[in-house]
């Protein structure tokens, strides 16, 4: 019976958002009013103004697409608390929430966009609060509340909430991947994958949410870009493209913003020094890309990279479309493929290479055995032998925290009945 109830709840909770049309996107411009957010160093730009501008551009794009509907958590310069932002999204019955921000750092060299999603720890904390609040729990479960009201089983409530948090986290992560993929067309990425964080605006278990950092206001070049209305529109368009790709699995957007489309290629060429992650690999001089990406460290220069990889400085400049001869810290540089030098180097070191190769072949089994033992030991160091159940925690939450399938946990703990755990209970996570 419990299995049937869980199936009904899972289906009723998640299915309606899939079939609903249009999809409602809650757009949350970070900060506002008395909270300016980050303030840029040179131009004195307020983050709250940048985020509101991008949010309005994104809403305009979504409203032109019949598959989407955009709603704003704030429409002008006024303050909204973090919890209120999620409540506003819920009031509009939003399917997804995108919170827009601009980053800042003490280091003026930090640059790039990133996407953040809810961490497991914050999800577990929030689930405990939702369970203790009867009104919130009833609001969250919606139609499923009638089913649960006849089952005095708190574990069932926990399981449903846990499923919702897990669904929101996974969905938010995939959405974040799509947005980052499109961001890479127009700007540097400070993080190549969505990052997990304990951020209040991502707290809704029923609304998959992502926080988008559009760049660093503390970086002089990104500051100038974010001060441009044209660039803000481009950022909004990349988020829109990410949503379309996430929703349909295609990048064929229905809305074609003429201004964005006309300037897209020209801007990428003009701002090549800012767009190291642009997908332009073809150049006029037919300089081949080796596929190597070098992250610039402190004190490194074009000359030192030239010596390290045995390539010409001019080739590095041309391949990366650099309009300067200085490198930025943490910048990603494409390394050219120099066939002549490569062949010469291979000829000189050919004998040494074969000796090393034979040595590696002879020791393969030994190395594999050592590696396997090392991995096993590392795993034991990372995963404790036991886990003590905290308040409102479920077996599903423990499974997510340690990335151990539920069926494995059940086999290690045969005393568990129907997967139910209680506060303070010790759960075995691995064999000794």
From Swiss-Prot:
Family the entry assigns: Belongs to the N-acetylmuramoyl-L-alanine amidase 3 family.
Biological process, per Gene Ontology: cell wall organization; FtsZ-dependent cytokinesis; peptidoglycan catabolic process
Known EC number: 3.5.1.28
Domain LysM span(s) in chain numbering: 292-335, 385-429
Identification of the protein by name: Probable N-acetylmuramoyl-L-alanine amidase AmiB
PROSITE patterns according to UniProt: LYSM
Taxonomic lineage of the native organism: Bacteria, Pseudomonadati, Pseudomonadota, Gammaproteobacteria, Pasteurellales
Gene Ontology CC terms, in alphabetical order: outer membrane-bounded periplasmic space
Span of domain MurNAc-LAA: 25-244
Gene Ontology terms for molecular function: N-acetylmuramoyl-L-alanine amidase activity
Role, per record: Cell-wall hydrolase involved in septum cleavage during cell division.
Record's comment describing the protein's domains: LysM domains are thought to be involved in peptidoglycan binding.
Signal sequence coordinates: 1-20
Native source species: Haemophilus influenzae (strain ATCC 51907 / DSM 11121 / KW20 / Rd)
Keyword Repeat annotated: yes
Subcellular location(s) of the protein: Periplasm
UniProt-listed Pfam families: Amidase_3, LysM
Keywords, in A-Z order: Cell wall biogenesis/degradation, Hydrolase, Periplasm, Repeat, Signal
Catalyses which reaction(s): Hydrolyzes the link between N-acetylmuramoyl residues and L-amino acid residues in certain cell-wall glycopeptides
